[in-house]
Protein backbone atom coordinates (compact mmCIF):
# COMPACT_ATOMS: atom_id res chain seq x y z
CA UNK A 1 0.00 0.00 0.00
CA UNK A 2 1.22 3.48 -0.85
CA UNK A 3 1.61 5.62 2.27
CA UNK A 4 1.09 9.35 1.81
CA UNK A 5 1.72 11.95 4.53
CA UNK A 6 -1.87 12.75 5.53
CA UNK A 7 -0.78 13.64 9.07
CA UNK A 8 1.38 16.60 8.03
CA UNK A 9 -1.62 18.54 6.73
CA UNK A 10 -4.33 17.57 9.21
CA UNK A 11 -5.64 14.60 7.25
CA UNK A 12 -6.35 16.33 3.92
CA UNK A 13 -4.01 16.52 0.96
CA UNK A 14 -4.44 18.89 -1.99
CA UNK A 15 -5.28 17.03 -5.18
CA UNK A 16 -4.66 18.83 -8.44
CA UNK A 17 -6.75 17.50 -11.30
CA UNK A 18 -5.40 17.85 -14.82
CA UNK A 19 -6.69 16.74 -18.22
CA UNK A 20 -4.54 13.74 -19.16
CA UNK A 21 -4.43 14.64 -22.86
CA UNK A 22 -4.16 18.44 -22.92
CA UNK A 23 -2.49 19.18 -19.58
CA UNK A 24 -5.19 21.74 -18.74
CA UNK A 25 -5.63 22.20 -14.99
CA UNK A 26 -9.27 21.37 -14.29
CA UNK A 27 -9.62 21.82 -10.54
CA UNK A 28 -8.09 21.60 -7.08
CA UNK A 29 -9.80 19.50 -4.44
CA UNK A 30 -8.79 17.65 -1.29
CA UNK A 31 -8.38 13.99 -0.49
CA UNK A 32 -8.35 12.20 2.82
CA UNK A 33 -7.06 8.65 3.23
CA UNK A 34 -10.48 7.15 2.51
CA UNK A 35 -11.00 9.11 -0.73
CA UNK A 36 -7.43 8.30 -1.80
CA UNK A 37 -8.04 4.58 -1.29
CA UNK A 38 -11.41 4.71 -3.09
CA UNK A 39 -9.79 6.49 -6.04
CA UNK A 40 -7.12 3.78 -6.24
CA UNK A 41 -9.75 1.05 -5.93
CA UNK A 42 -12.29 2.37 -8.45
CA UNK A 43 -10.22 4.40 -10.91
CA UNK A 44 -12.69 7.26 -10.54
CA UNK A 45 -11.61 10.53 -8.90
CA UNK A 46 -13.04 10.66 -5.40
CA UNK A 47 -12.42 13.60 -3.10
CA UNK A 48 -13.32 14.76 0.40
CA UNK A 49 -15.95 17.51 0.41
CA UNK A 50 -14.94 20.00 3.08
CA UNK A 51 -18.33 21.73 2.96
CA UNK A 52 -20.45 18.57 3.17
CA UNK A 53 -17.95 16.58 5.24
CA UNK A 54 -18.34 13.47 3.10
CA UNK A 55 -16.75 11.51 0.27
CA UNK A 56 -17.48 12.96 -3.13
CA UNK A 57 -16.98 10.95 -6.31
CA UNK A 58 -16.71 13.64 -8.94
CA UNK A 59 -19.60 13.70 -11.36
CA UNK A 60 -22.07 11.32 -9.72
CA UNK A 61 -24.72 14.06 -9.71
CA UNK A 62 -23.79 15.92 -12.90
CA UNK A 63 -22.50 13.05 -15.02
CA UNK A 64 -19.17 14.86 -15.42
CA UNK A 65 -17.04 12.07 -13.99
CA UNK A 66 -13.26 11.89 -13.93
CA UNK A 67 -11.66 8.63 -15.01
CA UNK A 68 -8.14 8.50 -13.58
CA UNK A 69 -5.46 7.78 -16.18
CA UNK A 70 -2.34 8.50 -14.11
CA UNK A 71 -1.49 9.55 -10.57
CA UNK A 72 1.63 11.36 -9.46
CA UNK A 73 2.69 12.35 -5.95
CA UNK A 74 5.05 15.21 -5.09
CA UNK A 75 8.49 14.85 -3.49
CA UNK A 76 7.13 15.24 0.07
CA UNK A 77 4.29 12.74 -0.40
CA UNK A 78 1.75 15.41 0.56
CA UNK A 79 0.29 16.61 -2.75
CA UNK A 80 -1.49 14.52 -5.37
CA UNK A 81 -1.73 15.10 -9.12
CA UNK A 82 -4.52 13.23 -10.89
CA UNK A 83 -4.37 13.09 -14.67
CA UNK A 84 -7.89 12.30 -15.79
CA UNK A 85 -10.21 11.81 -18.69
CA UNK A 86 -12.91 14.40 -18.01
CA UNK A 87 -16.10 12.69 -19.14
CA UNK A 88 -19.04 15.01 -19.77
CA UNK A 89 -16.98 18.07 -20.59
CA UNK A 90 -16.99 20.07 -17.36
CA UNK A 91 -15.03 19.76 -14.12
CA UNK A 92 -16.46 22.83 -12.39
CA UNK A 93 -19.78 22.95 -10.53
CA UNK A 94 -20.43 26.31 -12.25
CA UNK A 95 -20.68 24.47 -15.57
CA UNK A 96 -17.27 25.56 -16.89
CA UNK A 97 -14.75 23.05 -18.18
CA UNK A 98 -12.16 24.19 -15.61
CA UNK A 99 -12.60 25.71 -12.17
CA UNK A 100 -9.88 28.15 -13.23
CA UNK A 101 -12.13 30.17 -15.55
CA UNK A 102 -11.48 33.58 -13.98
CA UNK A 103 -8.70 35.70 -15.46
CA UNK A 104 -7.01 38.40 -13.37
CA UNK A 105 -6.98 41.62 -15.39
CA UNK A 106 -5.55 44.47 -13.37
CA UNK A 107 -7.83 44.84 -10.35
CA UNK A 108 -10.74 42.73 -11.62
CA UNK A 109 -11.64 39.16 -12.48
CA UNK A 110 -12.99 38.35 -15.92
CA UNK A 111 -14.79 35.09 -16.65
CA UNK A 112 -13.31 33.40 -19.72
CA UNK A 113 -15.04 30.70 -21.71
CA UNK A 114 -18.65 29.67 -21.76
CA UNK A 115 -20.24 27.15 -19.41
CA UNK A 116 -20.65 23.66 -20.83
CA UNK A 117 -23.85 23.11 -18.82
CA UNK A 118 -26.36 25.07 -16.76
CA UNK A 119 -25.81 24.23 -13.08
CA UNK A 120 -29.41 25.19 -12.20
CA UNK A 121 -30.66 22.46 -14.52
CA UNK A 122 -28.13 19.85 -13.45
CA UNK A 123 -28.24 20.40 -9.68
CA UNK A 124 -31.90 21.53 -9.49
CA UNK A 125 -31.06 24.33 -7.03
From Swiss-Prot:
Its EC number is 3.5.4.19. Disulfide bonds: none annotated. GO terms for molecular function: magnesium ion binding; phosphoribosyl-AMP cyclohydrolase activity; zinc ion binding. Mg(2+) binds at residues 74, 76, 78. It is found in: Cytoplasm. The keyword Zinc applies. PANTHER family: HISTIDINE BIOSYNTHESIS BIFUNCTIONAL PROTEIN, HISTIDINE BIOSYNTHESIS BIFUNCTIONAL PROTEIN HIS7. Belongs to the PRA-CH family. Homodimer. This is Phosphoribosyl-AMP cyclohydrolase. It comes from Desulfatibacillum aliphaticivorans.
Amino acid sequence: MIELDFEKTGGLLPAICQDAETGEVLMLAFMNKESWEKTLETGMATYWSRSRQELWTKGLTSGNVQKVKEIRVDCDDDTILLKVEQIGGAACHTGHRSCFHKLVEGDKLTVVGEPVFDPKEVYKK
